[in-house]
């Protein structure tokens, strides 16, 4: 009754107005699952390939090739298979593609089908997605890492680092965490406006003021936390996404906004100093994706007390993660479903991390849609942390709102991760 009977893929627009893939998967019993695929602005060199059409249409960014692949070749390969056989279906698509990075059919085609299959199977089973994927133990609501100041590739301003985040670890529930984040977000808006900064928002809903340095951005956030009535380091901690690969040039870190260039060791020391001065409990992509020596230095300096998240470093890839674990590099992986391109491989990356006592952070991309699948996956995998942007833009809020619904549905079973995510 849960055999796949049809796949209908289409081209839709993401939050940046660029085309992306949406897939509907229909089952024999009438169940249907729908998934829309996100896309990134700062992408790692080792990510699975997002297939784009080229040419004039949509300025070369069309995804009709990926849509056609889902509707024809992929459907021909998996049509009639039971949707509950997720691993089998994902492996068939991976083998059908036949490339190491999904460049023939496109990770956007494969992922769209993979997620839609899981959602259709969940509907057929009468279970919410988080319960279908995660089983009876899926009850941990993640601490949101809320990106309230944007820089780097996510904003048109001088700030070198890409994201400055607040983490409401002192909340008791996800609903309270969202409220706390919202209050700090709106307080920050007032503080920036009072100092003459613009309060337009970037791709992920955070503010993109013309600040020049990381300390300047952090000071604004610290003041806003206090003015909102919370205690930095207790109620609310901080996180950074440096996206260092973006400014790693000729073996050095070029901080144009701050007017200086740092060697690898000096960059690691700078980040360790920031983590010591401010209540920063998480640093993502502090070093460039292939600067393994720099990553080792940073891990040795501050890894015992700071979560060091590999995004471009690991690209949700279990093989690269195992390399990092073996080398003692970083202590956490950022999980982006479209970096690897299938649900099965995503879950494998999380399991690999947890077995090695690495944390995992479920994450959106800068190009998002109203699809809230990652909220369910964060709960399904007991990640304990989620990155899904700021407290504005409906493409970001869709995930927070889904987490609130999940918490409500879990009732007394629901647990909020809170301070348990803090290292040391």
Curated annotation (Swiss-Prot):
Q: One Pfam match, by short name?
A: Enolase_N
Signal peptide, first to last residue: none
| Residues binding (2R)-2-phosphoglycerate | 162, 336, 365-366, 387
Q: List the disulfide bonds.
A: none
Q: Name one GO cellular component term.
A: cell surface
What is the stated purpose of this protein? Catalyzes the reversible conversion of 2-phosphoglycerate (2-PG) into phosphoenolpyruvate (PEP). It is essential for the degradation of carbohydrates via glycolysis.
Family indicated by similarity: Belongs to the enolase family.
Q: In its UniProt entry, what is this protein called?
A: Enolase
Q: Which gene encodes it?
A: eno
């Amino acid at each position: 009754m849960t055999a796949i009977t049809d796949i209908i893929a289409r081209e839709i627009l993401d939050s940046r107005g660029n085309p992306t893939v949406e897939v509907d998967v229909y089952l024999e019993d009438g169940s249907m699952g729908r998934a829309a695929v996100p896309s990134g602005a700062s992408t790692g060199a080792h990510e699975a390939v997002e297939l784009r059409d080229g040419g004039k249409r949509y300025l070369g960014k069309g995804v009709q090739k990926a849509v056609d692949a889902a509707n024809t070749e992929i459907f021909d390969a998996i049509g009639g298979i039971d949707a509950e056989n997720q691993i089998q279906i994902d492996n068939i698509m991976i083998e059908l593609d036949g490339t190491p990075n999904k460049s023939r059919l496109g990770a956007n085609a494969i992922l769209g089908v993979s997620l839609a299959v899981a959602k259709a199977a969940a509907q057929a089973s009468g279970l919410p997605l988080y319960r279908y994927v995660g089983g009876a133990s899926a009850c941990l609501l993640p601490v949101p890492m809320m990106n309230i100041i944007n820089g780097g590739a996510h904003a048109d301003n001088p700030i070198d680092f890409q994201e400055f985040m607040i983490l409401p670890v002192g909340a008791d529930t996800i609903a309270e965490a969202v409220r706390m984040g919202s209050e700090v977000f709106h307080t920050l808006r007032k503080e920036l406006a009072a100092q003459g900064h613009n309060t337009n928002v970037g791709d992920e809903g955070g503010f993109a003021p013309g600040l020049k340095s990381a300390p300047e951005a952090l000071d604004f956030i610290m003041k806003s936390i206090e003015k909102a009535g919370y205690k930095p380091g207790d109620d609310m901690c901080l996180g950074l996404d440096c996206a260092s690969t973006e400014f790693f040039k000729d073996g050095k870190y070029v901080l144009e906004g701050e007017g200086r260039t740092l060697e690898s060791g000096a960059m690691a020391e700078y980040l360790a100093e920031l983590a010591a001065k401010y209540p920063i409990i998480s640093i993502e992509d502090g070093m460039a994706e292939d600067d393994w020596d720099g990553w080792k230095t940073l891990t040795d300096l501050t890894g015992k007390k700071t979560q060091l998240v590999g995004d471009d470093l690991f690209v949700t890839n279990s093989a690269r993660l195992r390399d990092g674990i073996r080398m003692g590099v970083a202590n956490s992986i950022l999980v982006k479903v479209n970096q690897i391109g299938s649900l099965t491989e995503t879950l494998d990356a999380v399991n690999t991390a947890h077995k090695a006592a690495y944390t995992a952070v479920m994450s959106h991309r800068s190009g998002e849609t109203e699809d809230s699948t990652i909220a369910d996956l964060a709960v399904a995998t007991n990640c304990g942390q989620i990155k899904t942007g700021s407290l504005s833009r409906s493409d970001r809020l869709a995930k927070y709102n889904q987490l609130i619904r999940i918490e409500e549905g879990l009732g007394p079973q629901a647990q909020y991760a809170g301070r348990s995510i803090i290292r040391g």
